[in-house]
């Protein structure tokens, strides 16, 4: 008898324990099944630096460093990418000719004779009637100078046809040498070192391995270095070197101001010599 009671008690305790363990699991399963879908989370991604961002990063670092000293750099359109883009929206005739010239799509709107030939005026004999032709006028349309040499203009009599050498400011003399380009200065076309380079030479590659975005200059050299180091490393290197160098240059410029030299003492005036009376010598 006691064994039966113990079995029943153990069975009841086992059932209660199983229910206590299974009830939370069942609750979470039912809750997850009845819960609506979660809202998608929006993550902000930052675009990695690329090689094309190097000129913009360089100009922004320069503008931030120079703005502290009151120097503002104007924006450069070629670096910001704000080029003039021509689309077909400004000129409808380029994309849809029918919007500007209806005669191209519907010829009957402009010339009724193309659709209804009977509308054109037909007068039989008006153009081909005999006797209606005009007699030719002798001499009309002919150049008298071709038959009479005396009517032609002599050579040099018309000053408006030619300009003597030296009278036209736009034309130089025969032996004149232009002095706009200094001799011996090779960095640029006009003797200056270009900063942004020549945009007309942008399609010429500097080497088979690397290509440049300009025709030479400081930015072109920086772009070539960036191709070798990588965009991110080059930007970090410029930011780490550019700002300290600017601050150090400004501090050295202020500290290197020469001190004022002491004033030169005035030269003392020479002592005045008293005048001497002439010696009178008696004459014998």
Curated annotation (Swiss-Prot):
Residues 80-216 are annotated as: Disordered. Residues 144-173 are annotated as: 6 X 5 AA approximate tandem repeats of P-[ATG]-[LG]-X-X. Residues 145-165 have a biased composition (Polar residues). InterPro entries: XGLTT_repeat. Its main location: membrane. Residues 92-121 are annotated as: 6 X 5 AA tandem repeats of P-[GA]-L-T-S. It is a single-pass type I membrane protein. This is Exported repetitive protein. It comes from Mycobacterium tuberculosis (strain ATCC 25618 / H37Rv). Residues 86-110, 202-212 have a biased composition (Low complexity). Residues 274-284 are cytoplasmic. Residues 23-252 are extracellular. Pfam families: GLTT. GO terms for cellular component: extracellular region; plasma membrane. Sequence repeats lie at residues 92-96, 97-101, 102-106, 107-111, 112-116, 117-121, 144-148, 149-153, 154-158, 159-163, 164-168, 169-173. The chain crosses the membrane at residues 253-273. Keywords: Cell membrane, Membrane, Repeat, Signal, Transmembrane, Transmembrane helix.
């Amino acid at each position: 008898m006691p064994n039966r009671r113990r079995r029943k008690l153990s069975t009841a305790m086992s059932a209660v324990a199983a229910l206590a363990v299974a009830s939370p699991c069942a609750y979470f399963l039912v809750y997850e099944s009845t819960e609506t879908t979660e809202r998608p989370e929006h993550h902000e991604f930052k675009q990695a630096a690329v090689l094309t961002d190097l000129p913009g990063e360089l100009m922004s670092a320069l503008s931030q460093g120079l703005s502290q000293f009151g120097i503002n750099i104007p924006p450069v359109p070629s670096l910001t990418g704000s080029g003039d883009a021509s689309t077909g929206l400004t000129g409808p005739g380029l994309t849809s000719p029918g919007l500007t010239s209806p005669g191209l799509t519907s010829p009957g709107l402009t010339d009724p004779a193309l659709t209804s030939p009977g509308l054109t005026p037909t007068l039989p004999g008006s153009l081909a009637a005999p006797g209606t032709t005009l007699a030719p006028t002798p001499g009309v349309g002919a150049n008298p100078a071709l038959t009479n040499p005396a009517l032609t203009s002599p050579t040099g009599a018309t000053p408006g046809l030619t300009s003597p050498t030296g009278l036209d400011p736009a034309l130089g003399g025969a032996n004149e040498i232009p002095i706009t380009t200094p001799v011996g200065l090779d960095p640029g076309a006009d003797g200056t070192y270009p900063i942004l380079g020549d945009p007309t030479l942008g399609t010429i590659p500097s080497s088979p391995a690397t290509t440049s975005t300009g025709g030479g200059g400081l930015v072109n050299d920086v772009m070539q270095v960036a191709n070798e180091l990588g965009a991110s490393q080059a930007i970090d290197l410029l930011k780490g070197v550019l700002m300290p160098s600017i601050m150090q240059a400004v501090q050295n410029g202020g500290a290197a101001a020469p001190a004022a030299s002491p004033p030169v003492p005035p030269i003392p005036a020479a002592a005045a010599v008293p005048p001497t009376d002439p010696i009178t010598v008696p004459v014998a």
